Each structure stands twice: as C-alpha cells, then as structure tokens.
Amino acid sequence: MSYELPKLPYAYDALEPHMSKETLQYHHDKHHKAYVDKFNKLIQGTKFEESPVGYVVKHAEKGPLFNNAAQAINHSFFWHSLGPDCGGEPEGPLLDAIKKANGSFEDFKKDFSEKAAGLFGSGWVWLVKNPDGGLDIVQTANGDTPFSGESRPLICCDVWEHAYYIDYRNDRAKYVEAFWKLANWEFAEDNFTAGADAEQRSTTHPMQRKGQHPHRPHSSH
C-alpha cells in the first residue's frame, strides 16, 4: 500500500504576498509529490514495505530510500510550519524556552535567520527540542532530517532553491525574512508541549497510506 501526497493545510494563495500561489503549486504539486512518488517506488520489496514512514527515516541506511522518505516528511512538516495570519512570536512555555536558550526572541530570530541564509547548498533549518528539554537551532543538509534522531522538531524553514526562487530569485535572505511573517507558532507550541510517544510524534509529519484515516492535523492559523 503506497503513501499519498498530503494536501496543503490551506489554499494555494493563502500565503500571499509572502509566498505566491505559483510557488506553492510547483513546490507542493511537483517537488513534494516527486519525493512521495519516488519513496513509494523505492520502498517496494524492502523490509520497510509495511513500515510507517517515520520508522523508515530512523532505521534505513543513508541513501535513496532514506533521502526520499526524509524529504517527504520534511515537506509535510514544513507546510504546517507556515500559515496565513501567522508570524509574530510564540507564547507561554515555548517563548520562555527560546529566551532561556537564546537570551531573547530577537536573538533567536537573528541566529535562526543567519543559519538559514548562510547554509551552504540546499537543506533545512529547524528549531528542535532536545530530550533534556532544551532547544537548539539545527541545520540539516540536502535531505537529512532531525526525525531520524531523538530531538523533536518544532518548526522548520526549507532553504532549497525551489522553495524561494520563483518569488525571490537568488535572495535567500529576503525569503527568510518572509518566513517570519508566516511562521506558525501555534503549531510549534503544540509540538513543544506534546508527549514524545510515537502516535503524537506521527501527527507532525502527516503522511498517510492510501485508504488510511488521517490524523487530525495541527492548526495552521
């Protein structure tokens, strides 16, 4: 049984003017779909054929199967990291944890932005919660993912060129500025306070097999 491309949690034009309808159509319908389709082909006949995609990224060797599984998960998580009428700052325990780790929310934004704009080549930048409860800003190159480790992703920014080239050409820094106007802190707060069991973690990358009843997604606004 193969996996389906998850639907966007909002309309294609919902993130304008910061992210265009054309970008979402290409990014979701072409790039994300290609990773899901390739993953479905590569998993056939392997020992992971009946495994959840989250299990695959934790246990598969680095290579084509891992890369496409990770990229499928990363993109699913990224769509929920954004939302219309979002931006601003988080609240409550997450904001307190960010201030504890970075000194202030503005210092956190500066550090995250520098890591996103400065990442060499393609990849992702994540805010993660470590097993000890502390927060880190993590860069992952190409198709790598923190879902393969023990830290829990809270929110992420895709810095592959296909995420921003239609709207911002080669100006990645300007794209990162726009990211902050779309950042879905309610989603990040839910991830920060959620339990660590497999069922709760699976809701953060809602890829479902065809015919499977989907989990209720996190709010995107």
Give the positions of each predicted feature:
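Feature for soluble, non-membrane regions of globular proteins
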Residues: M1-H221
